[in-house]
């Protein structure tokens, strides 16, 4: 962390906590829609991915992780439901693990966001194939 005052740090941490709660809600909604094959699955996954992207940005700002460049191994061809479930598990680990290792928690958060982006693209491709 940099020359940030404790007030600024507390403010960022409270914003991060709120963003993580919002991301958790959106991932739960995406999981629900994906498991029920709802018509707006792709949109639900996209909202969850965007919430995780925002949380990831706040996480990076809060803990000064500019130098951490996680390597994400994308799983192409994986069904959306599995990717959403795995994202939820990674988000859970990020929320619980940030007291132990902020770098590991950040990697989990980035991985979850990238899995959701892959799930969204897979869902869009699936929708486009149905239209053809």
Where are the predicted features?
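Long, charged/polar, soluble alpha-helical segments
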Residues: 1-132
């Amino acid at each position: 962390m940099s020359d940030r005052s404790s007030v600024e740090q507390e403010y960022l941490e409270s914003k991060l906590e709120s963003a993580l709660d919002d991301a958790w809600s959106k991932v739960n909604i995406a999981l629900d829609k994906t498991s029920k094959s709802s018509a707006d699955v792709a949109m639900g996954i996209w909202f969850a991915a965007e919430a995780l992207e925002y949380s990831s940005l706040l996480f990076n700002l809060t803990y000064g992780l500019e130098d951490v460049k996680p390597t994400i191994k994308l799983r192409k061809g994986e069904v959306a439901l599995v990717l959403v479930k795995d994202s939820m598990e990674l988000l859970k680990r990020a929320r619980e693990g940030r007291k132990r290792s902020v770098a590991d928690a950040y990697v989990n958060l980035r991985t979850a966001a990238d899995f959701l982006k892959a799930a969204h693209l897979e869902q869009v491709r699936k929708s486009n194939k149905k239209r053809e």
